[in-house]
């Protein structure tokens, strides 16, 4: 951009800046805060030491945040690029934004971005995802009309347009999320396709994908950057599902001397993968790596990793697979990478990366490559006779998982991997207050990286502020709950806060749809019963604790009342129901609610077991959807 006064800025440049702003504004709340800047520099993979990045971010916040509210608005962002742009810091910032590799620019429009914005997408990602999906769905008869896709064309963006591939990929990542009976597979009219896309988006949201900026029309139009963004989230959830101690106890083999299981459990899946790779590298006598980008570009660490995890033929029924290390000494990086990938192919793991992706150190695709290796060949043995308290590994409850998925679907940052540990500095809770329209004064909030000394004090101050906001601004009932409880990760008391946040969010969504009608439990119950009787249905509910809800018949009837004729009653079991019947009804009900456009986070088990909190959210979401169609 040429030098110019702030007032003179062309539409093209404004569009470019909007695009750049959206890249940095990860949670799409219209502001950039310093942890989003940290993420940007991390993702841009720039050759800068950590202290330099911190310096740049401090300077950007200092120069850019002109009204000192602790965040950068779009106007302040424009100012950085114009007034500060000659400085080295602004140049580095601009470089970081442009460092999204393998970028294809194309014009695209979305309601949120201005007309004709330049959107970019990565050819490498498209190529990788197409090959992964082709393999995953190669035997699925429902996908024959689009699979196999050609990775070198735009097949992918057309293939997702009817919603079927997306629904199938969601079920591969989190089995049983979508009831197959709810997917429309024949006579695909525009209306029916719209329903499939609703089902895919609302189900993606329920497994923790951030889909706030994506509409069904974007997927139908096959907008590349949105399609790839959604697919990456779905694929990553599947790849990471088992990189978690309670689902994979052998990970305890990665414990270091003097480290407790509890400390290991706090690591994110990415950190565990790095720890896993280094465990095997150490055993091979090779140096450790610190990332899946710069440190793996020469493929040498990968050669050693493959050699360590390849089956040695010592277990029964497990054929030995020999890794040929001769390519290790190849002088050309690309040829060495190709040779390494040929060895990965022997393990059936040549996925996600091309030689060029390895050599360029593409962080996203290399992470996926390693996660897939871990899932196929973890090569870990659960430690015996060590002094380990295995009772800690209970895994999260259904309710905890639902809350976590809800938070992640709203795009909180950092991503919540472990409910209590990741809320101990209250940053996520404060972001959730913003989502429920409770203003947060970010200048009062301490943000990472926290100082080595007194880090916990900084986190505790945030927790105290979060509780104070809950009591005074949100008017939550927080009797006997203090900041210390959040900071300690007290499960019961943290859940009490989180539930009130989710409840308020659900009611807000409903009130927005119902032109501001205030919602209480009684109002929802009365609306449900009124709607059912008007539609001539015989079901009704007394309250959200009503045991008859376990059949899901009231939910199914309500969906049919909201969108007459959408329920196939041949699939619904009535009369004397077995547990399996109840579960099948509930599964169908939840998927159909999502298909008609209700963003339901609850799970079928919540209906079968009549969990009042989650039952409330189901009926509230349906009421919101019902009021929209009036």
Curated annotation (Swiss-Prot):
Residues 109-382 are annotated as: Actin-binding 1. Ca(2+) 1 binds at residues 25, 27, 29, 36. Residues 383-627 are annotated as: Actin-binding 2. One of its GO terms (cellular component) is actin filament. One of its GO terms (biological process) is bone development. The modification Phosphoserine is found at residues 268, 293, 326, 339. Ca(2+) 2 binds at residues 65, 67, 69, 71, 76. Transmembrane segments: none annotated. Pfam families: CH (PF00307), EF-hand_7 (PF13499). GO terms for molecular function: actin filament binding; calcium ion binding; structural constituent of presynaptic actin cytoskeleton. Residues 123-239, 267-378, 397-506, 518-627 form the Calponin-homology (CH) domain. Keywords: Actin-binding, Calcium, Cytoplasm, Metal-binding, Phosphoprotein, Repeat. SUPFAM superfamilies: Calponin-homology domain, CH-domain (SSF47576), EF-hand (SSF47473). It is found in: Cytoplasm. Residues 12-47, 52-87 form the EF-hand domain. The keyword tRNA processing does not apply. The modification Phosphothreonine is found at residue 391. Monomer. Actin-bundling protein. This is Plastin-3. The gene is Pls3.
């Amino acid at each position: 951009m040429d030098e110019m006064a702030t007032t003179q800025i062309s539409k093209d440049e404004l569009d470019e800046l909007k695009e750049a702003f959206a890249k940095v504004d990860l949670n799409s709340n219209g502001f950039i805060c310093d942890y989003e800047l940290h993420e940007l520099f991390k993702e841009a993979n720039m050759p800068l030491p950590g202290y330099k990045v911190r310096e740049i971010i401090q300077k950007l916040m200092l120069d850019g945040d002109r009204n000192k509210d602790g965040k950068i608005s779009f106007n302040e962002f424009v100012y950085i690029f114009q007034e500060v742009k000659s400085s080295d810091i602004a140049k580095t910032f601009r470089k970081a934004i442009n460092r999204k590799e393998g970028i294809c620019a194309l014009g695209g429009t979305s309601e949120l971005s201005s007309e004709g914005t330049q959107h970019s997408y990565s050819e490498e990602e498209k190529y990788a995802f197409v090959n992964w999906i082709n393999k995953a769905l190669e035997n699925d008869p429902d996908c024959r009309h689009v699979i196999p896709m050609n990775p070198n064309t735009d097949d992918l963006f057309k293939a997702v347009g009817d919603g079927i591939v997306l629904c199938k990929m969601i079920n591969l990542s989190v089995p049983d999320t979508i009831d197959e009976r709810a997917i429309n597979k024949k006579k695909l009219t525009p209306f029916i396709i719209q329903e499939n896309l609703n089902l895919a988006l609302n189900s993606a949201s329920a497994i923790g994908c951030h889909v706030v900026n994506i509409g069904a029309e974007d997927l139908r139009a096959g907008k590349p950057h949105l399609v790839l963004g959604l697919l990456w989230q779905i694929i990553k959830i599947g790849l990471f599902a088992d990189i978690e101690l309670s689902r994979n106890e052998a990970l305890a083999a990665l414990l270091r001397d003097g480290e407790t299981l509890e400390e290991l459990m706090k690591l994110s899946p990415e950190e565990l993968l790095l720890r896993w790779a280094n465990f095997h590298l150490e055993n091979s006598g090779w140096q450790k790596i610190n990332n899946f980008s710069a440190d793996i570009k020469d493929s040498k660490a990968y050669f050693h990793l493959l050699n360590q995890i390849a089956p040695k033929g010592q277990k029964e029924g497990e054929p030995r697979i020999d890794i040929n290390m001769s390519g290790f000494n190849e002088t050309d990086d690309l040829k060495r990478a190709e040779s390494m990938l040929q060895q990965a192919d022997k393990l059936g793991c040549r996925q996600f990366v091309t030689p060029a992706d390895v050599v360029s150190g593409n962080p996203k695709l290399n992470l996926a490559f390693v996660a897939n290796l871990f899932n196929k060949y973890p090569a870990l043995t659960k430690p015996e006779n060590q002094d380990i308290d295995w009772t800690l590994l209970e895994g999260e409850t259904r309710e905890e998982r639902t809350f976590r998925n809800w938070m992640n679907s709203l795009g909180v940052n950092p991503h919540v991997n472990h409910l209590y540990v990741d809320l101990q500095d209250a940053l996520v809770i404060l972001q959730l207050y913003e989502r429920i329209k409770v203003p947060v004064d970010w200048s009062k909030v301490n943000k990472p990286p926290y100082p080595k000394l007194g880090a916990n004090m900084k986190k505790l101050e945030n927790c105290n502020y979060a509780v104070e906001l809950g009591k005074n601004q949100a008017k939550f009932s927080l009797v006997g709950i203090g900041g210390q409880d959040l900071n300690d990760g007290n499960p019961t008391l943290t859940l009490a806060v989180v539930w009130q946040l989710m409840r308020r969010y659900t009611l807000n969504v409903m009130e927005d749809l119902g032109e501001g009608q205030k919602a209480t439990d009684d109002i929802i119950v009365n609306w449900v019963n009124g709607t059912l009787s008007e539609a001539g249905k015989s079901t009704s509910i007394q309250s959200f604790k009503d045991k008859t809800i376990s059949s899901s018949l009231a939910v199914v009837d309500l969906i049919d009342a909201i969108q007459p004729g959408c329920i196939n009653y041949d699939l619904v079991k009535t009369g004397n129901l077995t547990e399996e019947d109840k579960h099948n009804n509930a599964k169908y009900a939840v998927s159909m609610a999502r298909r008609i456009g209700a963003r339901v986070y609850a799970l079928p088990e919540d209906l079968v077991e009549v969990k009042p909190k989650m039952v409330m959210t189901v009926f509230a979401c349906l009421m919101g959807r019902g009021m929209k169609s009036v």
